[in-house]
């Protein structure tokens, strides 16, 4: 898909806009194998991004104040239209517009169980980015 573009981190002070493949509604094979799971993603959705934000963490990576793997996609504060959904997604439908929280909450800690995912005790197990 020629219009599926992302901003990719190339190194301190360097980013590029690149075309990428349209995503599949599945867990990448290498991740599924490493985690001992199937590639099926019944709880997932695919969004067509309608707006994104340049976050401070993106700027820190680009300016060399923090590290980032070369090739990482930037932009993790997004709003998008649901274009595809897994068969176990219950409260979101194709065509819905939704915003994605900037943090990756664990869903298991005390705060998450109290629906305070914005202050998850185990937030962002990896790093910011898509």
Predicted segments, located by residue:
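Generic structural detector for well-ordered beta-strands
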Residues: 19-24
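Active-site/binding-pocket entry motifs
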Residues: 14, 53-55, 126
């Amino acid at each position: 898909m020629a219009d599926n573009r992302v901003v990719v981190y190339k190194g301190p002070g360097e980013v590029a806009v690149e075309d990428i493949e349209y995503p599949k509604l599945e867990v990448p094979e290498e991740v599924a194998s490493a985690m001992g799971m199937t590639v099926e993603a019944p709880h997932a959705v695919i969004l067509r991004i309608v707006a994104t934000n340049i976050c401070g963490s993106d700027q820190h990576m680009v300016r060399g104040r923090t590290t980032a793997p070369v090739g990482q996609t930037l932009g993790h504060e997004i709003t998008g239209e649901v274009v595809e959904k897994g068969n176990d997604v219950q409260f979101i439908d194709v065509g819905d517009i939704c915003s994605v929280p900037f943090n990756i909450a664990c869903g298991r800690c005390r705060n998450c169980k109290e629906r305070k995912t914005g202050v998850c005790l185990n937030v962002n197990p990896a790093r910011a980015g898509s």
